[in-house]
Each structure stands twice: as structure tokens, then as C-alpha cells.
Amino acid sequence: MKTHQNHHLFGPIEHVGRIIKSAISKIRDFLIKLNHRFLLPFNRTKQKPDFSLAAAKEPKSRREVLKKLAFLPFFGGIAWTFFSSKESSASPIVPVPDSCGTFQRRTLEELEGNIPQGKLGNKSVSRLILGSNPFCGYAHSRDLKYTSSLFRAYFTREKLIETIHLAEQAGINTLNLCTWEQQHLINQYNKQNGSNLHTMMQVRPTKEDLYSDIDRSIDLGVDFIQIRGVEGDIFARDGNADLLQKCVDHTKRQGYPVSVGAHDVHTFYACDEAGIEVDFYFKTLHHDRYWSALPKKDRLPFGVQGPKNTNRNPYHDNMWCLFPGDTVSYIQKLNKPVVGFKVLAGGAIYPDEAFQYAFDNGADFICVGMCDFQIVENANAAIHAIEKANNRQRPWYG
């Protein structure tokens, strides 16, 4: 009789508790979905973006939304009491053991000096330049398929602002950009935060339209023009160095420093034959002492721009300075600033080693794509590499 009375007493309450628990779950799911609009990258938002540092710190992550909903379980407490005995067979949540390790990101307090600067045109530029390919999702990851989407998901508007601000605080004052949206972002960032970050735009001329990309970039306020390495290689490979000459001359007439980017040293051989005078050089610069580097027997002039191949040996996005010895020899003869890029070989070489190789072998600046948690470590690596390269063969330019 007592058992029947207890069942009669708590049955309705258990039913109410079940309803409350279901409602809580639905509310959480709805608010999380609603909050997704705050996690979209800058170039996907329709509202006018706020590029201030305060806006970047606003709580907009899903975790923070759930923290704000901490009060909801209180209202489901009664229901949970009656469910706990029925769900006791579920596996408990096990804390992550310390043996899994934790990531220790370096802070600004751990900077080990100031990044030296040099001159490009009439601007003082940090010898470590922030590359933007990761911001766009350009990940040279061999045959891994997920890395590009991972970068695009990671670099939300807030994360971009945070990364740029951290780079500025670490002494990086110049960015190499690959989209006009990024230039808009820097313009707003400089305006709202009283900063003076310089920008170098990768432009993409075509045979049909040589100048529009250059003119648009200048109109948006860039400081330097860099003809993208893809176009530099292809124009030179196809015997159209004269078109590169036109792009360089068009930029110079407007008073802007200009470079032809190149993945292949043969691009600069073609530019020299055409008499092209750039203001600075922008060249891939890394060694080939990593396991995924293309075998020497398979390296061909302009191979970086050749068709991608599924076979093991032909080029397949695994090396960007196919002739490092010839590249270093060429750089030694130059009397203008050289910016080395792809120095990490798409993440295959550690920064300490990569930066030292680049500066020892003639680079005056290096352009490196990086995430926020890599900036302080890379700044320190650049500072020390420059210090150790003081006895290098080529004088410093810029």
C-alpha cells in the first residue's frame, strides 16, 4: 500500500520534471544555433563590423553562451532528482588526465627583445612580416584535406583582430594581405585603435586585365604592391615577362614600391632578361632537408605552377623553393631588399631553423603566416636569428 501511495505521489512530479528537462535542452539548442551568427568570419557578416579591440573581446563563443545559461539547471533540479536513479547506468564524465599534456602559449611578457626594422621604400618595416594566407584558408598541407577549412573556421573576425593586435604588440608592423576585405579590416583597425600598420597587397594581374587589381589595391590604401608569386611564375614561364614589366611600371608611376613575387628563381632570370627593375624582391626561401621535399630528380623549372599530380614523385604542393642552392646564389648578387616567404616550407621546418636559414642566406625580411599562439615564439625566433646572422655574406638591405 505504501509503495502504491509513493508512486501515486511522485508520478506526476516525475512527468513534470521530464517536461522541464526537455524544455531546457531545447532552449539550449535554440540559443546555441542563434549564437552561430556571431561566429561567422568578417567577410560573411552583413552588418557593419566593429574592429575595435573591445568588440573583439565581447563574449560571443558558444562556451560563453552556455555559461550564461548556468541558471537553467536550477529550474530542472526537481526533475533531475527523479531521473538520477533511472540514469545511473550512464558512464560518468572522466576528467582529461594530465598525461595528455597542455599547450603552453607564450605571452608578451616572454618577448626577448625588439624585432629589428629595415626600410622598404620610405617605410620602416619589421624584419618579420605577418603573412595572411592562413587567414584565407590557404594551407599548404600536402594531401591533408581538412586544414584549409580548419583555418577558415578558426579565423573568425574576433580572432583576426586579436591576432593582428598581438602581432602589433610583439613588434610586427607590416602585413602581407591576399584580399581587399583584409585591407578594409586593417584600415578600420588603424583608425579605431590609433595604429599605423603597413600593408603589402598580393595583386593578381591577368593578360586581359593587367591593372585593375593594382589600382583597386592602391585606392584602398595599401603601402606596397606585390605581384603574386603565382602570376609572376606563370607570366615568366609563358614568355610574358613584358607584361610583368608593364605592371611594375604602372605601379611605379603612381609612386608605390613594387615587387614581383616568385616561387621559382627562373622567374627572376626572365625578369632580368626583360630589364625589369623592382623595388624589392619577394622570393620563396627554404632548404630541402625535410622528408616530404620533392626529390631532386623530379624538380623542374616552374614546377610549382605545373599540374598537380596524384603520383608519388611529381610535384604535389610539397615544396616551394625547388632550387634552394641557385636561389641563394642569386640573392647574394642583389643590391635591393629581399623578402623571403614560405620559409617554413608549409610548416615542415621549425621556425628557429627556418628563420636562421633565411637570414643567413641573404633575406632582409621574412614573411610568415602564423596563428595568434605562434606570434611571440616566432618573434623571439626572428630576433635571435637576426642577431646570429650578423656575419652573413650578404650585407643587410633596407
Regions found by a protein language model. Give the residues of each.
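N-terminal secretory signal peptides
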Residues: M1-S61
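Active-site-adjacent beta->alpha loops and helix N-cap segments on the catalytic face
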Residues: E181-K191, D209-L210, D233-C247, P324-G325, ...
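Catalytic alpha/beta core domains of metabolic enzymes, predominantly
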Residues: G261-F355
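Glycine/proline-rich, positively charged
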Residues: V203-D279, G306-T310, M319, L334
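N-terminal export signals
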Residues: N43-F51, A55-E58, E64-E87
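C-terminal helical cap(s) of enzyme catalytic domains, especially alpha/beta-barrels
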Residues: F373-P395
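C-terminal segment of N-terminal export signals and the immediately downstream linker at the start
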Residues: E58-P59, W80-S126
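Conserved, mostly hydrophobic/aromatic
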Residues: L130, V258, V338
